[in-house]
Amino acid sequence: MARSLKKGPFIQERLLSRVLEMNQKGEKKVIKTWSRSSMISPDFVGHTIAVHNGKTHIPVYVSENMVGHKFGEFAPTRTYRGHAGGKAEKGGSAPKRK
């Protein structure tokens, strides 16, 4: 379910204030954040935000296409290592029937 329009987007205030401060100074530093639920606003474009995935911070360079999405979408929390089971034979496919 989408967030109500009267509430507006959620952006962590400290994160937004840091980015606005850096925009005024003209700096570009990596900013660490644990706020995966913060929405990306146009002020973040061009900055690199290190988003926490539960273990480490993953650097995310914000582009114009990301505006309106949330930071958590770009820092996956789960690693896929393949399904369990026997390994396939070197031939690649099952033997052919006659």
Swiss-Prot record:
Family matches, as SUPFAM superfamilies: Ribosomal protein S19 (SSF54570)
Keyword line: Ribonucleoprotein, Ribosomal protein, RNA-binding, rRNA-binding
Record keyword Aminoacyl-tRNA synthetase present: no
A GO biological process held by the record: ribosomal small subunit assembly
Annotated Pfam families: Ribosomal_S19
Residue ranges of the region described as Disordered: 76-98
Annotated PROSITE patterns: RIBOSOMAL_S19
Gene Ontology CC annotations of this record: cytoplasm; small ribosomal subunit
Top-level taxonomic group: Bacteria
Family: Belongs to the universal ribosomal protein uS19 family.
Cited NCBIfam families: rpsS_bact
Entry-linked PANTHER family: RIBOSOMAL PROTEIN S19P FAMILY MEMBER (PTHR11880), SMALL RIBOSOMAL SUBUNIT PROTEIN US19M (PTHR11880:SF8)
Record function comment: Protein S19 forms a complex with S13 that binds strongly to the 16S ribosomal RNA.
Protein name (record): Small ribosomal subunit protein uS19
Origin species: Chloroherpeton thalassium (strain ATCC 35110 / GB-78)
